[in-house]
Structures are given as structure tokens and as C-alpha cells.
């Protein structure tokens, strides 16, 4: 065989340039970059060194042959011509990977079979002995890539992908591959920082991938030093003595590296379930003396190295997959920015993000950005110098002011840490951190919120209202509904029309989310966001999350439970507050019937008002359970019935009389538990006729709905005494939206 070989090194997309630099430093010559790969020439020693020391490659492929290919027969004969007896025993095992298409081969499985057949036919002995297939741990892993009519046949020297270092047997929900983590560390300057004695901290460390890769770089440990089986282990071209020499050198370097004073490397993770898996991974990597992991929230992140050294803060914040994650992610980035400004002054920071726009919300400029791919997801690496001249907070500054700051950087006094009598550091007093500056649009939005608060303040205090709407798409470009629930904020984003640029809509949403906590003086962790779109069927009642957290609020002397996270609606329709208060005033001594009861908030008000009995009918067991808790919360139980069923069918079967009836139906509903489909416009007459048949003499029925195009059937006005009371059922907080609902008072004609 030749003394020099053509090598292909594959890597994640975006790492090609870094890998080329690394491979060249390890001895690869004539290096050229390709998409997700590099190629070059090397001797066997360099090929081994690349397998052992490359922190960035996925695979090291040794090219056996290139040949032109027009069809499947060319493929078969091109592979057959290789002297496979120089590479594999006749009773060995193989696995074949095929990539590319064309030249009559559009199915990679078919292409792999042709390659396998050629190898087997070449090595089959007269007595029938032949290689077999082992896709997991073969003696030889063969790769063929078809590229524009040329077949490139290679041996995979790495075996399993080189990112599998062997230490990470436990991982979190969205792990970074080890070689991507190493690339991020290298781009962030960690090799330089580590060589200078700097520290490293990860405030969202998960199971510790950044930490372990950083430790191996700092301790000069070859990333695959613990790998026992390689793609070349059973290859007949393998040179064991040369490999042992390189491996022994790597062991000696690791021993010397670990004998040094350990770098200060710390990780913090909010999820307690990930702490032990992270520690286990660190122990498997042999770095327990170098790396420590603690449970901790981003909000309390404060790295305190033992020698007061500065260093690198590195993290990979979650990307957010569920509807409603926008708010929590925005505030996570804001918290991270605050902690960097407060606790990491003069450090460097590297934030790897799948949402670069959120990176702008940290309140610190990035001086450099790099594009990466995490699988199929495009990402950015934001590099930050945590110095005051990079902070984007407080008042706006002119370009001239910024230039003066750059020319005359602020010197930050390093305060000597005080120790207690036991020699332990005394934690300093917390520092007040400036809020991240709002964008021009965000400030305009904040001003509107504060104006609305001021306008409604006197009314809210006079009425003793705990939950109300403070904003309802007042500004067309900020199409949100914002409700205050005591000291929580519930934000509903109305889906933007398709004509609106999604990036602009997203930017405006982020502007609004940044403004809300400041304008309303609310903890940013108490803001919940949802997207409200046109609902169909039972979709409006479908669970959006499963946190199961209930908040107790008060209204008109009753206590009610709301859930801001799990469903599109919260369990309390704020626009119907005046109707519930009316029912409470009129319910004394009466039999109250609540149809389409939802969480039975109207029934609670009726019971509070002294109703003789209440009956609440709804199709959903979930909401009736919620209703039961609402009633129990106020001490009501025995005389309050909760009935699960289709309202129309229930009315047809029921023969009781009621003095006060409230109907607030959905616009449209279907369910496996009901016969047919309910449409409020179509079915209004039948519904009201059935309900009026249950109304006692002198009784009152209140009918309301939120369908904006609803028209009350004229036959009802001829049949009953009907009064439109909509104007009396809309409070000040919904006065901007007079079409939020329609309401009628219906009685039997005298």
C-alpha cells in the first residue's frame, strides 16, 4: 500500500473552517474544505493522530479508490477490482454506507447492496467462506460516496462517530454533540483563556458537555483516548506498533495535564434531575477533580473562582418548542444579561443560540457572531466582552459618546473579598442592575400600558377588582390582549395575518414582552403568553400545557381559581364580570341554572348571592372538576349540582324549573360525547326555547355569546320579551372593544 493516503474528514455543517485549521495543525497536508467535510493527504501516523486528537471531526475516511461510474455495473466492477484480501479476512464482517445518487442509482440501500456484493464476491473462498454483514461493530466499515458521476470508495478509520467520546452515557432533552460543543469552545477562545489560567462557568450546564470538553482541552486530554474499538482495529492495513506509540504519547500528555493545578470549571443547572447524570459524565471523563456541578437558577448565577480570576461564561439556552415559550425564553435571556452585567464584569461570554433575536435582549452587545448548525437548526454563537462600554442599558448615547467610552474605558475597581471568621467568603450585598433598554417601539408600547393603567386605576381601586384587561390591541402593530390577574400577567397574541412579515411580527412581540414587566411593575417570571387563533370544534378547550398550577383570585367577594398556562383560556372570562355581578345581586332565594357552565364561576357568584340552589351543566369533566374546586374554595357544596352532559340533550330530558338561567354558549362545538354539532347562530332558537321551557313563572334568562357576527333570530323577539343589555354588561376595561360579547335579558311575555 502507499505511504500517503487521501483522507476525508466529515464534520457538522459550519465546522469546516475550524476542522481544516485543526487537521492542518495535526499534520494533514493539501487541505481543502467541502460541505460538512474537508480533505487532504497524510501518512498513516497522521491518520491515526487525527482519529485520536480531532475534537471536531465526525469520521476519518481513508480513500481506497476513485473511479468513474455510469451505472450499477460500473459500481460493482469498480469495487470488485480492489484487492480486498489486503484489507479484510474472508470470514470478517463488514458494514457498508452509501451516500449520493445518480448514475442509475437513486436508492442508497440498493447502492450499498451492490458494494457489499462486490466485496463478498471478491473474498468468497472455494469452500464458500465469505464475509458477513454486521451493522453495529463490523471489522471493516466501508463508505462509498457518489459525487457527479464519480465514486469515492473509502474505509472508515474511526468506526463509530468520533463525537461519541464515551463519557456521555446520560444526556438531557436537547444535547449538543460533543464535537459541536468543542467547536463552540474553540471559537469562544477557551484554549487561550485556559492557557492563561482563566475560569469557565456554564449557568445552564445540563449534563455537562461544555464542562467536560473544556476540561479535556485545558488538561490536554485527547478526546478519544478512552476509545477501545476503532474502525481500523481489525483492518489488515493497521500498524499496531505505530498506534501504540501515539496512544502512549497521548496518555503521557493527559497524565501531565491532570497533574497541573486544575482549571476552575463550574456548572450550574436548575433541573435537579440532571445534576447526578452530569456528575456521572464528568467522573467517566476522569475530570471530577477539575469540574464541579451545582444546582442553581440563572437568576442566582454568580461564578466566584477561588483566585478571583476572570474567564469565560458559556451556555446553550433552551430553544423553546411549545407555544407560549416566547415569554419565558425572553426573560431567561434578560436574566442572563443581568447576571452577566452584575456578576461577571470583565469576563468573556459565549452564548450559543437558536434564537439570535433573543440574544439582543441580554442588554450587552456581541462583538462577534459565528454561524453554526445544531443538526438541522441554524444557530448563532454570540461572543461578548462583559464590559460597561458594551452594555445596552439606561439612556441612549450618541455615537460621539460611545466613541469617547471606547477611547476612555471605565476602570472597574476590583474589591477584595471579605472573609468570615471561618475563612469563607462573605457574599456581597446585591447590586441593583439597570433594566435593559427598550427599543423605540417597545418604549412606545410601555408608555401606552402605563397610560392605560393610570386611566383605569381609580375605577379598579373603587370596584376592588383583582383581574382586568389593561390592553386590547390598542396599537394595531402590537396585536395583543393583556390581562392582569392579581400580580400575574396573561398575554394573548392574536395571530398576525399572512400579509405581515413574520420577522417583523416576532420583533414586535419581543419588544412588547420586554416592555410589559417594566411598564406594569411585574416580575418578568409572572408573564404568560399564548397565541390566539381562530378556533374550531373543541380546539379552544384543548390542553396547551400540563403544569397544573392554579392561582387564586378574587372577584365580588368570591374566590376563584385560574390557570394561566395549561389552556388557551384561563377559567375566568373577564369580559363577563358585570354579568356575574348581576347574577350575584339577583340570585337570592332563587334556583339558578348555568348552561355551558365552563368552570361555573357564575354559579359561585349565584351561591354567594344566596341562591337556593345552583345547577351547572357542561360537557367537560375537566371543567366540572375545576368548578367543584371553585365551589369548595368558597365553602359551597351540597346544594350545588354539577351535571356532565350535552346541554341540548340535558334540557330535553330535564323537567325541573329554575328562576334564574344563564346561557353563555360557544360559537361552535363538537365532541364525541354529543350528538351532532352545535352552532350558536343556527341552533339559538332551539336552545332558548328548551331553556325557556324550564324557566319558572316570573323568571329571567340571560343569554350571551362572543360570536361577533351573531344576529338574534327575530322569532325569539316575537315569542318572548327580549331586551338587549349588552351596554350594561361591559366594564371599563373592555369599553375599547364593544363587540367583545352580546347579551340579552329574556322573559316570558305577560
Swiss-Prot record:
For this protein, the record's Pfam families field holds: Methyltrans_SAM, RlmL_1st, THUMP, UPF0020
> Single GO molecular-function term?
23S rRNA (guanine(2445)-N(2))-methyltransferase activity
Query: Which UniProt key words apply to this protein?
Result: Cytoplasm, Methyltransferase, RNA-binding, rRNA processing, S-adenosyl-L-methionine, Transferase
Has UniProt tagged this entry with the keyword Methyltransferase? yes
Q: Return the EC number.
A: 2.1.1.173, 2.1.1.264
* InterPro entries reported in the protein's UniProt record: 23SrRNA_methyltr_KL (IPR017244), DNA_methylase_N6_adenine_CS (IPR002052), RlmKL-like_Mtase (IPR000241), RlmL_1st (IPR054170), SAM-dep_methyl-trfase (IPR019614), SAM-dependent_MTases_sf (IPR029063), THUMP_dom (IPR004114)
Q: Which GO terms describe its cellular component?
A: cytoplasm
User: Does the record carry Zinc as a key word?
Assistant: no
UniProt-listed SMART domains: THUMP
Q: Where does this one sit in the cell?
A: Cytoplasm
Which Gene3D superfamilies would you find in this protein's record?
3.30.2130.30, RNA methyltransferase domain (HRMD) like, Vaccinia Virus protein VP39
Top EC group: transferase
Q: Which reaction does it catalyse?
A: guanosine(2445) in 23S rRNA + S-adenosyl-L-methionine = N(2)-methylguanosine(2445) in 23S rRNA + S-adenosyl-L-homocysteine + H(+); guanosine(2069) in 23S rRNA + S-adenosyl-L-methionine = N(2)-methylguanosine(2069) in 23S rRNA + S-adenosyl-L-homocysteine + H(+)
Give the similarity note.
Answer: Belongs to the methyltransferase superfamily. RlmKL family.
What is its biological role? Answer: Specifically methylates the guanine in position 2445 (m2G2445) and the guanine in position 2069 (m7G2069) of 23S rRNA.
State what protein this is by name. Ribosomal RNA large subunit methyltransferase K/L
Amino acid at each position: 500500500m502507499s505511504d500517503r493516503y487521501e483522507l476525508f474528514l466529515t464534520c457538522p455543517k459550519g465546522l469546516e473552517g475550524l476542522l481544516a485549521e485543526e487537521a492542518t495543525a495535526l499534520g494533514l497536508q493539501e487541505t481543502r474544505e467541502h460541505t460538512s467535510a474537508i480533505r487532504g493527504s497524510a501518512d498513516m501516523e497522521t491518520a491515526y493522530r487525527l482519529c485520536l486528537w480531532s475534537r471536531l471531526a465526525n469520521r476519518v475516511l481513508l480513500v481506497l479508490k476513485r473511479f468513474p461510474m455510469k451505472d450499477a455495473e460500473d459500481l460493482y466492477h469498480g469495487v470488485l477490482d480492489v484487492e480486498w484480501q489486503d484489507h479484510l479476512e474472508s470470514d470478517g464482517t463488514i458494514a457498508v454506507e452509501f451516500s449520493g445518487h445518480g448514475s442509475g442509482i437513486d436508492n442508497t440501500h440498493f447502492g450499498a447492496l451492490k458494494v457489499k456484493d462486490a466485496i463478498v464476491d471478491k473474498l468468497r473462498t472455494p469452500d464458500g467462506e465469505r464475509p458477513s454483514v454486521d451493522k453495529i461493530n463490523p471489522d471493516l466499515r466501508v463508505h462509498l460516496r457518489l459525487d457527479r458521476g464519480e465514486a469515492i470508495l473509502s474505509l472508515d478509520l474511526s468506526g463509530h462517530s468520533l463525537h461519541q467520546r464515551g463519557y456521555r452515557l446520560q444526556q438531557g432533552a436537547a444535547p449538543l454533540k460533543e464535537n459541536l460543543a468543542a467547536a463552540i469552545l474553540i471559537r469562544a477562545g477557551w484554549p487561550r483563556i485556559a492557557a492563561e489560567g482563566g475560569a469557565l462557568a456554564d449557568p445552564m450546564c445540563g449534563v455537562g458537555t461544555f464542562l467536560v470538553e473544556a476540561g479535556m482541552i485545558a488538561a490536554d486530554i485527547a478526546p478519544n483516548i478512552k476509545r477501545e474499538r476503532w474502525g481500523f482495529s481489525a483492518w489488515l492495513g493497521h500498524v499496531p506498533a505505530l498506534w501504540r506509540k501515539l496512544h502512549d504519547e497521548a496518555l503521557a500528555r493527559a497524565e501531565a495535564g491532570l497533574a497541573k493545578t486544575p482549571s476552575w470549571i463550574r456548572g450550574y443547572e436548575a433541573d435537579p434531575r440532571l445534576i447526578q447524570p452530569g456528575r456521572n459524565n464528568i467522573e467517566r471523563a476522569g475530570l471530577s477533580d477539575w469540574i464541579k456541578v451545582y444546582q442553581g437558577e440563572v437568576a442566582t448565577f454568580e461564578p466566584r473562582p477561588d483566585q478571583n480570576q476572570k474567564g469565560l461564561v458559556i451556555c446553550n439556552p433552551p430553544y423553546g418548542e411549545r407555544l407560549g415559550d416566547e415569554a419565558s425564553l425572553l426573560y431567561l435571556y434578560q436574566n442572563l444579561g443581568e447576571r452577566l452585567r452584575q456578576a461577571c464584569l470583565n469576563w468573556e461570554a459565549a452564548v450559543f443560540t437558536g434564537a439570535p433575536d433573543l440574544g439582543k435582549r441580554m442588554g450587552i452587545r456581541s462583538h462577534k457572531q459565528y454561524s453554526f448548525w445544531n443538526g438541522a437548526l441554524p444557530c448563532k454563537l454570540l461572543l461578548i466582552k462583559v464590559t460597561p462600554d458594551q452594555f445596552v442599558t439606561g439612556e441612549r448615547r450618541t455615537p460621539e459618546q460611545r466613541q469617547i467610552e471606547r477611547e476612555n474605558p471605565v476602570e472597574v475597581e476590583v474589591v477584595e473579598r471579605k472573609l468570615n471568621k471561618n475563612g469563607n467568603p462573605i457574599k456581597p450585598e446585591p447590586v441593583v442592575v439597570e433594566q435593559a433598554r427598550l427599543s423605540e417601539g417597545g418604549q412606545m408600547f410601555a408608555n401606552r400600558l402605563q397610560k392605560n393603567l393610570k386611566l383605569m386605576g381609580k375605577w379598579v381601586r373603587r370596584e376592588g377588582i383583582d383581574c382586568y384587561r389593561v390592553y386590547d390591541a390598542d396599537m394595531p402593530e402590537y396585536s395583543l390582549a393583556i390581562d392582569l390577574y392579581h400580580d400575574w400577567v396573561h398575554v394573548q397574541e392574536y395571530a398576525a395575518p399572512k400579509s405581515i412579515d413574520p420577522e417583523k411580527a416576532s420583533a414586535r412581540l419581543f419588544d412588547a414582552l420586554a416592555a410589559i414587566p417594566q411598564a406594569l411593575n411585574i416580575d418578568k417570571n409572572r408573564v404568560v403568553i399564548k397565541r390566539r387563533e381562530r378556533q374550531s370544534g373543541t380546539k379552544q378547550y384543548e390542553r396547551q400545557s400540563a403544569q397544573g398550577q392554579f392561582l387564586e383570585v378574587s372577584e365580588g367577594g368570591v374566590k376563584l381559581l385560574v390557570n394561566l398556562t395549561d389552556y388557551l383560556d384561563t377559567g375566568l372570562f373577564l369580559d363577563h364580570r358585570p354579568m356575574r355581578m348581576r347574577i350575584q345581586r339577583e340570585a337570592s332565594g332563587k334556583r339558578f341554572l348555568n348552561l355551558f357552565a365552563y368552570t361555573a364561576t357564575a354559579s359561585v357568584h349565584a351561591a354567594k348571592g344566596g341562591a337556593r340552589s345552583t345547577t351547572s351543566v357542561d360537557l367537560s369533566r375537566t371543567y366540572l372538576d375545576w368548578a367543584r374546586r371553585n365551589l369548595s374554595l368558597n365553602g359551597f357544596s351540597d346544594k350545588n349540582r354539577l351535571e356532565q352532559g350535552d346541554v341540548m340533550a340535558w334540557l330535553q330530558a330535564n323537567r325541573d324549573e329554575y328562576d334564574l338561567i344563564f346561557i353563555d354558549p360557544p360559537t361552535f362545538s363538537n365532541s364525541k360525547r354529543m350528538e351532532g354539532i352545535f352552532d350558536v347562530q343556527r341552533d339559538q332558537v332551539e336552545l332558548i326555547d328548551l331553556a325557556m321551557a324550564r324557566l319558572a313563572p316570573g323568571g329571567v334568562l340571560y343569554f350571551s355569546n362572543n360570536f361577533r357576527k351573531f344576529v338574534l333570530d327575530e322569532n325569539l323577539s316575537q315569542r318572548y320579551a327580549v331586551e338587549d343589555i349588552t351596554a350594561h354588561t361591559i366594564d371599563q376595561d373592555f369599553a375599547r372593544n364593544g363587540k367583545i360579547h352580546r347579551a340579552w335579558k329574556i322573559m316570558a311575555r305577560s
